[in-house]
Amino acid sequence: MTDAPPIIRLRHLRKEFDGTIAVADLTLDVAEGEFICFLGPSGCGKTTTLRMIAGLERPTAGEIWLRERRIDPLPPQQRGVGFVFQNYALFWHMSAYDNLAFGLRVRGVSPAEVDARVREVAESLELTPVLRQRASRLDLSAMQRVALGRTLVVQPQVLLLDEPLNNFRPGLREVMRGELKRMQLSLGRTMVYVTHDQEEAMTMGDRVLVMHEGRVEQVATPREIYRRPATLFVAGFIGRPAMNFIETQYQVEDGRAFLRHDALRWEIETRREAVERQAPSGRVIVGIRPEDIRPAVLAVPEGRRGETLPVQVDLVQPLARRKIVDVKVLDLVLKMVVPGTFRVDAGQTLDVVMDRGALHLFDPQTLRAIG
């Protein structure tokens, strides 16, 4: 999908509020028909970026293009984008039909065309049975679809969504997440979706843009972001439980390259050149996900296991199908994930294996991935 020509082009976008940088030098292409998620913690700049695309905030610097037209000087109504707010902004006293028709009537569209377009959108979003109901009497799913339909009916080229599922209870959020993704696939519209919820971004987005303190940390597919985080921030932000981090020192012993933390060490001969080139100080942060630390008694894929390491079990948190286990080794407390059926208790000693093929390496000075 991302091979399609870009429909949105952001070039060196910057936004300051009273001298505080909210968005710094953001450049991005969004492909036609793509579902891209802007992900990051509160205050990272993701909503500000969305509002600049919509025309609700004026960039301090940079350009915004929609296809071959530069739109950042234009008012919101002339940009060809639709914005779906977190609170839906419906007219509660009006019917679903009148909510859908409102934008067209304001634009002076003829009654016949208004009716045709409203009914077309209502059918595509399965709203036909509730068109005459007041918005205040709709269930949350229908409210979501009316808010989306009200934007679709004016035929925007791009849909911008600012945390539209934020007010839903967890179970309903999962249902609506799937419904929204299905709608996007069936309509084929380009969507830019802002969320602080990594599960939403990783399950819905064709690509995910991760932001932190106004800067883009990484733009990639969900799979690549999880498997190959580009920065220390992305590595720690993506994944639950979070990645374990261990400060190490690069050493060469008998011609072999190692990363060492006290008595712990990992041979990294295949990554030696990258470490020497990208971490000249010799200091390296090793990251390993909890699921890549395994009890030695459980099967580990051949050729990927590391050395067996005795640890002390500090805490066991049982979940539905797995357990999160805190283990102590030397001065470290690491998290690991085991199957829910695996018997383990706090206080016992356990032999574990850290999968050396799953180590992530970071330069503590640049905070970027090595290799």
Set out the residue ranges of the language-model regions.
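Helix-to-loop junction immediately C-terminal to a conserved catalytic motif
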Residues: 54
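Glycine/charge-rich catalytic "coupling/switch" loops of P-loop NTPases
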Residues: 227, 256-258, 262-314, 342-371
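Conserved ABC transporter NBD signature motif
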Residues: 62-70
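The feature captures the beta-strand-to-loop junction immediately N-terminal to the Walker
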Residues: 39-41
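ABC ATPase nucleotide-binding domains
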Residues: 76-82, 86, 90-233
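ABC ATPase nucleotide-binding domain helices that frame the ATP-binding cleft
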Residues: 47-50, 146
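ABC ATPase nucleotide-binding domain
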Residues: 9, 29, 65, 351-353
